[in-house]
């Protein structure tokens, strides 16, 4: 089972959404941020299931989304660039369903 510590190790913060009352994980970038949920829009807890990453600008306007096959696929992308770097944001954007 995935925990906040697993996500923190690869640079993600943890937050609770007041509307849905679920835990999401996210990462901040310059003028943008991304969030992670499972495919049902809930807290990701199963390392073998797909995860949805959604990107937003500073005004919380939706930019794009990607699907990661599983937690390992997300970890592999995170190892390619520093957390919160522009390079990592571009890698996330280009990494749909890998």
Residue ranges and their predicted role:
Residues 11, 25, 41, 81-82:
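Short, flexible coil/linker elements and helix-boundary hinge sites characteristic
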Residues 1-31:
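Negatively charged, low-complexity tracts enriched in Asp/Glu with abundant Ser/Thr
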Residues 12-13, 66-68, 80:
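Assembly/interface hotspot detector across virion components, adhesins/toxins, and nucleic-acid enzymes
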Residues 4-5, 13-14, 27, 37, ...:
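Intrinsic disorder/low-complexity signal
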């Amino acid at each position: 089972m995935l925990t906040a510590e697993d996500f923190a190790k690869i640079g993600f913060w943890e937050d609770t959404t007041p509307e849905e009352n679920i835990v999401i994980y996210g990462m901040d970038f310059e003028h943008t941020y991304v969030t992670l949920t499972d495919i049902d829009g809930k807290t990701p807890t199963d390392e073998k299931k797909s995860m949805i990453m959604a990107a937003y600008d500073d005004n919380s306007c939706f930019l794009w989304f990607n699907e990661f096959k599983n937690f390992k696929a997300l970890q592999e992308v995170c190892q390619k660039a520093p957390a919160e770097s522009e390079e990592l944001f571009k890698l996330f954007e280009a990494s749909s369903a890998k």
